[in-house]
């Protein structure tokens, strides 16, 4: 993404935010550390918009960690409200799905950086995020592996993939996955009692009130509270739809033009 497109995206966000003061921007890939000079300039530009428009930007960085260094960590710890560190769990699981360009795994390269990053953030305002697939249905082992590495904020989520892909989750996998969630819950309770507790994103639910009415109506907020911006400035309901022409909403210069598509996400 160019600086010009990024600035226009922030201008679009401010112009369409109404009376909402807190605005969220996630630098998401691709890999934003490959274009980090633009990330830094966009953060500075966003800060310059806060006072005149009575806004507060909450920036998030999502990274695979390969290019992560001390300078990026220092900037992120100063400017990013949250960081998301991509790792799939055990070494063999992560390296199978996340090889580097030379075909080698990324686990040994990123784990020391991620552990340092988490400690620099005092084990808050971050999470390590993995994806489980048909190849690692025993995903609770990956969650516990990340906890054993010292991470306190963990999210491991099911892959979203076309059904023909060999790594896609299948209907026959569901009983095993449900067992894994039960297994994980029991182990988390045990560790909490032992003083070794950690947070698992999908278990962080308000058991007394549950989802609020607005959330039940709008779901994840795609197309209404959330938009994805491509490097060329095109707008989509979320990153899952990027590249699908039938879901293109418009662009950051002309705004949302396909209102009929956006309205589908309000139902």
In which residue ranges do the predicted regions lie?
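Catalytic cores of large soluble enzymes that bind and process phosphate-bearing ligands
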Residues: 1, 34, 176
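Short, acidic, Ser/Thr-enriched surface-loop or helix-capping motifs
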Residues: 230
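Membrane-interface junctions of multi-pass transporters
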Residues: 217-218, 243-267
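Radical SAM enzyme [4Fe-4S]-AdoMet core and its adjacent flexible, acidic
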Residues: 92, 96-108, 115, 119-226, ...
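Cysteine-centered iron-sulfur cluster-binding motifs in ferredoxin-type domains/subunits
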Residues: 31-34, 223
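Radical SAM/AdoMet-radical enzyme domain recognition
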Residues: 3-28, 35-159
